[in-house]
Design a protein with these regions (language model features):
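Proline-centered turn/helix-capping motifs that create local helix->coil transitions or kinks
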Residues: 34-35, 54, 83-95, 147, ...
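Structural preference for long, well-ordered alpha-helical segments in enzyme cores
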Residues: 22, 80, 119-120, 135-138, ...
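Cytochrome P450 proximal C-terminal region
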Residues: 44-45, 49, 157-159, 163, ...
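Cytochrome P450 heme-thiolate monooxygenase catalytic core
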Residues: 1-133, 151
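Conserved cytochrome P450 K-helix/beta-meander segment immediately N-terminal to the heme-binding cysteine loop
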Residues: 98, 201, 217-245
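Cytochrome P450 I-helix active-site segment
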Residues: 44-48, 67-74, 92-98, 140-191, ...
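Cytochrome P450 catalytic-core helices
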Residues: 130-155, 267-283
Length: 317
């Protein structure tokens, strides 16, 4: 709350600001503690790991994305590793990390320290990288659509006054805010590709796909299919009214995947988004310079290359 309040009256690069915030939120939620003085180094380690996934050179050579990614992972292993025995000895924490440390398999064995660290690396990366991209996309569209920004501000204020936190029961009241968020994710999917492997032979689009073939779902393509999304390039949150959603194919909107492997963090993402947007819109207007159009990096996770320059204007001005 205080961090967001500090944006008022400033011109900010939104992406790095929100990334630091979501990393801190993820640390508090999943570790039970803030990162403290190591926050910047932890953040950079996650950035390096994600960028390594699309590095052209697939060996960890010096000065390559893969090399930086491997170093980033090694840092996180050293960071999380010593905490495992500490949490096991303590035995009382209710955060996700503590529960991983105490968890037992059906045969009574525990996860190894290496397995726990790998789980935490993935969980922390998933819990802040994609939501950073998603909220940044939403902020970009809020700044472009002042009419919708006013609608969502009114909805947020009706749920809770400025300066007050949303109660859990208030989250469901932000229906138009959720519609706007979903349309932002349709326009800029936080995960441009969802890799899978064919479990059986099948045919699709006139092609025969053998079992074992590496395949991929492209949300970015699916979200622009005119047969499901009339005038797909137009930004329109009313596409997500309950009637519209019921009338549409259930897999026409897949920023979080779908089926049995749908993103487990879906509702955590919605909750974070609503809390962040409530604190922003009840205190300030999001504005951009006339003609401003940032260039976006598409892979591995979309983000504005310049960080997204926003003017955060206090509502009393």
């Amino acid at each position: 709350r205080d961090r967001i309040a500090g944006w008022a009256g400033r011109d900010i690069q939104f992406y790095p600001e929100i990334k630091q915030l979501t990393l801190e939120l993820a640390a508090t939620a999943f570790l039970g503690i803030p990162f403290g003085p190591d926050a910047d180094r932890v953040n950079q380690a996650f950035v390096d790991m994600v960028q390594a996934s699309v590095g052209v050179v697939r060996r960890p050579l010096p000065f390559t994305q893969m090399g930086r990614g491997v170093k980033g992972r090694a840092f996180l292993v050293d960071y999380f590793g010593p905490m495992v025995e500490q949490r096991r000895a303590d035995g009382s924490g209710e955060d996700m990390f503590s529960q991983f440390c105490r968890a037992e398999r059906e045969d009574g064995s525990r996860l190894t320290a290496a397995e726990i660290v790998d789980h935490m690396n993935f969980l922390m990366m998933a819990a802040h990288d994609t939501i950073t991209s998603s909220v940044t996309s939403m902020a970009w569209y809020l700044a472009q659509h002042s009419d919708w920004q006013e609608r969502l501000r009114a909805e947020c204020l009706s749920a809770a006054p400025a300066g007050e936190g949303l109660a859990y029961d208030d989250l469901g009241k932000l229906e138009e805010t959720e519609m706007f968020f979903k349309e932002a994710l349709r326009m800029i999917a936080p995960v441009p590709s969802i890799p899978r492997r064919a479990l059986r032979d099948f045919s699709f689009g006139g092609y025969d796909i053998p079992a074992g073939t590496a395949v991929s779902v492209s949300p970015s393509f699916t979200h622009m299919m005119a047969e499901y999304w009339p005038d797909p390039e137009r930004f329109d949150p009313t596409r997500f009214t309950s009637d519209q959603v019921k009338a549409r194919h259930r897999f026409a909107w897949v920023p979080f995947g779908g089926g049995a492997h749908m993103c487990l963090g879906l509702h955590f993402a919605y909750m974070q988004m609503k809390i962040i947007v409530h604190h922003m819109l009840t205190r300030m207007r999001l504005e951009i310079e006339p003609g401003y159009a940032p260039e976006w990096q598409a892979w591995p996770i979309p983000k504005p290359k310049d960080g997204l320059r926003l003017r955060m204007v206090p509502l009393d001005r």
